[in-house]
Curated annotation (Swiss-Prot):
Major subcellular site: secreted
Signal peptide coordinates: 1-26
Organism annotation: Ethmostigmus rubripes
GO MF: toxin activity
Tissue note: Expressed by the venom gland.
TM ranges: none
Modification comment: Contains 4 disulfide bonds.
Keywords annotated in UniProt: Disulfide bond, Secreted, Signal, Toxin
Top-level taxon in the UniProt lineage: Eukaryota
The protein's name in its UniProt record: U-scoloptoxin(16)-Er3a
Family classification: Belongs to the scoloptoxin-16 family.
Location in or out of the cell: Secreted
Coiled coil feature spans: none
Keyword Signal: yes
Amino acid sequence: MNTVSVVQFLAVVCAVFVLYGRGVFAAEGVKKAGQHKDAELCLGSDGLGHRLDEFWYNDDMCQRFLCFKDDEGIMYEQIANCPIAIAEGDCTLKPGTKGHYPDCCPAVECPPEDQKEGEI
């Protein structure tokens, strides 16, 4: 990726957006990765070396990481976090399951639209 592509990529993945109009917001971030002693590995924020284009996880924080290299050879670490979940109206917040991102993320559950209409 050239500099413009990286900026465009950052603008897209760092944008906060609403999913389904139900109050679920999501964000991802990208940061320049540190230099590992093995030039083919990316130094992750966990302090360990990781292969390019392979995912690793922090299950305690419910995060997924990916290391990639741009066209100029600069390594970046992409960090995917759980969406911010806000339950509004008849919707409820359901905790995530244990395990890797995104399964460990909480989710907003809402009754089906036809069930809501029958209540009126």
